[in-house]
Amino acid sequence: MKGFSHTLQPYIGCRFGCSYCYVSQSNVHRFYNGGMEWGSYVYPRVGIAERLETELATLHRRDALERAAIFMSSSTDPYQGAERTYRLTRQCLSVFQKYPPGLLVIQTRAPLAARDFDVMAALGKRCLLNLTIETDREDVRRVLTPHCPSIQQRLETARQAREHGITTQLTVSPCLPFSGVEAFGELLLESGDRVIVDSYVAGDGGGGKRTARTAIPGLYARSGWEDWRSQEAALSLYDWLSRRIGNLAGWSREGFTRQARSVTGNVC
């Protein structure tokens, strides 16, 4: 992921199977799917914590650990259901306690993350928790991400994280149809320290071309929603948030990588 020095994937595949997920168009999916649809499989990367410790120890010896910005995860959810069984994410966090990087960003949509708030809090400002909340409408969630936790569950997880002193970013990524700018915006501000807004066109890594090959165009058409390629709603929400919280609101890639660039010194 541009802007970060490393990414970390405790699992291959993701059972949340979001209809818009760009990973379904990636080489990772094509290599590992075995003919299965995106969202129907997950493979635990057993031994990932041991490999992580080796890598972090090397960075430590080279005095490079403070300049490491790690994103967990860009092609899976580290707290999907398999984590209850395999605990790979928890194992990795224990390694990060031993070798804390300059920045660790944890990206999830799962309330299971609350299990590990003790470790995240112990990492202090080195750890950011990103919680995906793309809309405030449950009807939209049920159509586009039916296997994901409810919006209310995720908002409550964000509030609990803040109570534990964990810096929490809500990622409206991608921005899905929502009830209204002010209503959704206020809900986000009540629950997170920062907010990142993204769109299909700005955020799928292909100017919308990847999204065009997913189920999204058909789902939007059948639901009677506006053109999925329009960025008007996402930009309106971002503008409203920017007026309220300034640079604590971020847009697309720049928003995701702002803290990472301050650690790594990378321009992009």
Regions found by a protein language model. Name each.
Residues 75-77, 109-111, 132-136, 173-175, ...:
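Active-site beta-loop-alpha junctions enriched in small/polar residues
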Residues 95-102, 156-168, 232-252:
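A structural motif corresponding to the C-terminal end of an alpha-helix
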Residues 70, 104-106, 129-131, 168-172, ...:
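Hydrophobic faces of well-ordered beta-strands that scaffold small-molecule active sites
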Residues 84, 118, 141-144, 173, ...:
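A short secondary-structure junction signal
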Residues 180-268:
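Auxiliary Fe-S-binding modules of radical SAM enzymes
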